[in-house]
């Protein structure tokens, strides 16, 4: 039974944004990772056609876009994102770390199955208004 020890885990560059490093692993059915974002490094709003996603916030506070709604979430909150649901985040603190879990698609990287949205500016504006 594999146990991944925190002092043995190595962060690797994200597939979609190589300047961001993530600790990520893939099993047979799921892929998981520990992700830390700093202000300005978050991905733009997007959706996944094949992946459901869970995010458990370990530290930090953020504005969250889920579909047509925005809200805030902070350490201890668990977010579920159904597949095909447009979602995005904006950091309200300087840094945010979370544990992410998705069903596996592709080679197992967390950023695979990443689909851009056509109304990006509108969604970013919506996130900017959330306090």
Predicted features and spans:
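Short acidic-glycine-tyrosine-enriched beta hairpin
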Residues: 68-83
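A short glycine-rich, His/Asp/Glu-containing loop-to-beta-strand
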Residues: 10-45
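Short beta-strand His + acidic residue motifs that chelate non-heme Fe in jelly-roll/DSBH
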Residues: 45, 64-65, 81, 87-93, ...
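Short, charged/polar surface micro-motifs in flexible loops or helix N-caps
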Residues: 28-30, 38-41, 61-62, 70, ...
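A generic "binding-loop/recognition-motif" signal
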Residues: 39, 50, 69, 85-86, ...
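Double-stranded beta-helix
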Residues: 3-5, 9, 29-31, 88-131
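Short, conserved beta-strand element in jelly-roll/cupin
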Residues: 36-38, 47-64
């Amino acid at each position: 039974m594999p146990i991944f020890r925190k002092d043995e885990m190595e962060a690797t560059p994200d597939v979609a944004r190589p300047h961001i490093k993530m600790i990520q692993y893939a099993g047979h059915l799921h892929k998981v990772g520990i992700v830390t974002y700093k202000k300005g490094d978050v991905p733009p709003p997007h959706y996944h056609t094949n992946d459901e996603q869970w995010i458990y916030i370990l530290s930090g506070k953020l504005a969250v876009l889920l579909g047509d709604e925005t809200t805030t979430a902070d350490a201890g909150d668990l977010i579920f994102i159904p597949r095909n649901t447009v979602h995005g985040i904006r950091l309200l603190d300087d840094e945010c770390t979370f544990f992410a879990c998705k069903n596996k698609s592709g080679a197992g990287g967390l950023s695979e199955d990443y689909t851009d949205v056509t109304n990006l500016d509108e969604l970013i504006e919506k996130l900017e208004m959330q306090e």
